[in-house]
Regions:
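Short glycine-centered helix-capping/turn motifs at secondary-structure transition points
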Residues: 66, 118, 156-157
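Generic secondary-structure signature for well-ordered alpha-helical cores
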Residues: 60, 64, 116, 145-152
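Short alpha-helix plus adjacent loop in nuclease-associated cores
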Residues: 100-117
Length: 157
Protein backbone atom coordinates (compact mmCIF):
# COMPACT_ATOMS: atom_id res chain seq x y z
CA UNK A 1 0.00 0.00 0.00
CA UNK A 2 2.78 2.45 -0.90
CA UNK A 3 0.49 4.87 -2.65
CA UNK A 4 -0.90 6.77 0.32
CA UNK A 5 -0.87 10.57 0.04
CA UNK A 6 -1.02 12.62 3.23
CA UNK A 7 -2.22 16.20 3.51
CA UNK A 8 -1.40 18.24 6.61
CA UNK A 9 -3.62 21.27 7.13
CA UNK A 10 -2.05 23.38 9.87
CA UNK A 11 -4.79 25.95 10.36
CA UNK A 12 -5.61 28.82 12.66
CA UNK A 13 -7.62 26.76 15.14
CA UNK A 14 -6.52 23.18 14.52
CA UNK A 15 -4.15 20.81 12.78
CA UNK A 16 -5.51 17.96 10.70
CA UNK A 17 -3.99 15.20 8.63
CA UNK A 18 -5.91 13.41 5.90
CA UNK A 19 -4.82 10.24 4.13
CA UNK A 20 -5.89 9.56 0.54
CA UNK A 21 -5.69 6.37 -1.50
CA UNK A 22 -4.38 6.04 -5.06
CA UNK A 23 -7.77 7.10 -6.43
CA UNK A 24 -7.70 10.32 -4.39
CA UNK A 25 -10.42 9.18 -2.01
CA UNK A 26 -10.02 10.13 1.65
CA UNK A 27 -9.42 7.04 3.77
CA UNK A 28 -8.52 8.56 7.14
CA UNK A 29 -8.48 11.86 8.99
CA UNK A 30 -7.35 13.00 12.40
CA UNK A 31 -7.68 16.55 13.76
CA UNK A 32 -6.70 18.31 16.98
CA UNK A 33 -7.40 21.88 18.07
CA UNK A 34 -4.72 24.07 19.58
CA UNK A 35 -4.90 26.87 22.11
CA UNK A 36 -5.53 30.46 21.03
CA UNK A 37 -3.47 32.90 23.12
CA UNK A 38 -4.61 36.54 23.47
CA UNK A 39 -1.94 38.37 25.54
CA UNK A 40 -3.41 41.83 24.78
CA UNK A 41 -6.39 43.15 22.83
CA UNK A 42 -5.70 42.66 19.11
CA UNK A 43 -2.82 40.26 19.74
CA UNK A 44 -3.16 36.60 18.75
CA UNK A 45 -0.48 33.97 19.38
CA UNK A 46 -0.01 30.22 19.19
CA UNK A 47 2.48 28.02 21.01
CA UNK A 48 4.75 26.64 18.25
CA UNK A 49 5.76 23.64 20.39
CA UNK A 50 2.09 22.71 20.85
CA UNK A 51 1.53 23.00 17.09
CA UNK A 52 4.57 20.82 16.33
CA UNK A 53 3.51 18.17 18.85
CA UNK A 54 -0.07 18.10 17.56
CA UNK A 55 1.16 17.92 13.96
CA UNK A 56 3.16 14.81 14.80
CA UNK A 57 0.15 13.30 16.61
CA UNK A 58 -2.33 13.88 13.78
CA UNK A 59 0.08 12.40 11.23
CA UNK A 60 0.66 9.28 13.34
CA UNK A 61 -3.07 8.84 13.96
CA UNK A 62 -4.08 9.35 10.32
CA UNK A 63 -1.50 6.78 9.19
CA UNK A 64 -2.75 4.37 11.86
CA UNK A 65 -6.43 4.92 10.94
CA UNK A 66 -5.53 4.30 7.27
CA UNK A 67 -4.03 0.95 8.24
CA UNK A 68 -0.73 2.09 6.79
CA UNK A 69 2.89 2.46 7.86
CA UNK A 70 5.16 5.49 7.37
CA UNK A 71 6.88 3.64 4.51
CA UNK A 72 3.55 3.52 2.66
CA UNK A 73 3.50 7.29 2.20
CA UNK A 74 4.18 8.27 -1.40
CA UNK A 75 3.71 12.03 -1.02
CA UNK A 76 2.91 14.74 1.50
CA UNK A 77 1.20 18.09 0.99
CA UNK A 78 1.21 20.85 3.59
CA UNK A 79 -0.97 23.92 3.99
CA UNK A 80 -0.26 26.54 6.63
CA UNK A 81 -1.62 29.59 8.40
CA UNK A 82 -1.07 32.27 5.83
CA UNK A 83 1.23 34.89 7.36
CA UNK A 84 1.53 33.47 10.87
CA UNK A 85 5.17 34.05 11.85
CA UNK A 86 7.56 31.99 13.97
CA UNK A 87 11.27 32.60 14.54
CA UNK A 88 13.40 29.88 16.07
CA UNK A 89 16.97 29.08 17.00
CA UNK A 90 18.50 27.18 14.06
CA UNK A 91 20.81 25.22 16.35
CA UNK A 92 18.29 24.15 18.99
CA UNK A 93 15.06 24.26 16.98
CA UNK A 94 13.43 26.10 19.88
CA UNK A 95 11.22 29.12 19.16
CA UNK A 96 12.28 32.51 20.45
CA UNK A 97 8.64 33.55 20.96
CA UNK A 98 5.14 32.29 20.40
CA UNK A 99 3.91 32.38 16.82
CA UNK A 100 2.35 35.72 15.92
CA UNK A 101 -0.86 34.77 14.12
CA UNK A 102 -1.94 36.33 10.83
CA UNK A 103 -4.87 38.23 12.45
CA UNK A 104 -2.62 39.89 15.04
CA UNK A 105 -2.48 43.71 14.77
CA UNK A 106 0.39 44.52 17.17
CA UNK A 107 2.44 45.89 14.26
CA UNK A 108 0.00 48.72 13.49
CA UNK A 109 2.49 51.39 14.63
CA UNK A 110 5.23 49.87 12.46
CA UNK A 111 2.87 49.96 9.49
CA UNK A 112 1.91 53.60 10.19
CA UNK A 113 5.59 54.60 10.37
CA UNK A 114 6.48 52.74 7.17
CA UNK A 115 3.48 54.27 5.37
CA UNK A 116 4.35 57.90 6.15
CA UNK A 117 5.16 60.26 3.27
CA UNK A 118 3.38 58.20 0.59
CA UNK A 119 5.52 55.13 1.26
CA UNK A 120 2.35 53.01 1.11
CA UNK A 121 2.43 53.37 -2.68
CA UNK A 122 6.18 52.76 -2.83
CA UNK A 123 5.85 49.45 -0.99
CA UNK A 124 2.94 48.35 -3.19
CA UNK A 125 4.92 49.23 -6.33
CA UNK A 126 7.96 47.25 -5.17
CA UNK A 127 6.22 44.23 -3.63
CA UNK A 128 2.80 44.20 -5.26
CA UNK A 129 1.29 44.10 -1.77
CA UNK A 130 -0.08 46.76 0.54
CA UNK A 131 1.48 47.65 3.87
CA UNK A 132 -0.60 45.69 6.38
CA UNK A 133 -0.31 44.09 9.81
CA UNK A 134 -1.19 40.81 8.07
CA UNK A 135 2.23 40.23 6.51
CA UNK A 136 5.28 38.62 8.12
CA UNK A 137 7.83 41.41 7.52
CA UNK A 138 6.40 43.80 10.13
CA UNK A 139 5.95 40.87 12.53
CA UNK A 140 9.64 40.00 12.20
CA UNK A 141 10.60 43.63 12.86
CA UNK A 142 8.38 43.61 15.97
CA UNK A 143 10.05 40.40 17.17
CA UNK A 144 13.55 41.78 16.55
CA UNK A 145 12.66 44.96 18.45
CA UNK A 146 10.86 43.31 21.37
CA UNK A 147 12.25 39.84 22.10
CA UNK A 148 15.30 40.01 24.37
CA UNK A 149 18.41 38.77 22.59
CA UNK A 150 16.73 38.02 19.27
CA UNK A 151 18.33 40.83 17.27
CA UNK A 152 21.76 39.89 18.61
CA UNK A 153 21.15 36.23 17.75
CA UNK A 154 20.05 37.21 14.24
CA UNK A 155 23.16 39.36 13.78
CA UNK A 156 25.33 36.40 14.81
CA UNK A 157 23.63 34.27 12.16
Amino acid sequence: MSDIVLAIDQGTTSTRCMAFNHSGEPIAVHQLEHQQIFPKPGWVEHDPIEIWEKTQLVVREAIKKAGANPGDIAALGITNQRETTIVWNPKTGQPYHNAIVWQDVRTDKIIAELGKNDSQDRFRTITGLPLATYFSGPKIKWLLDNVDGLREAANRG
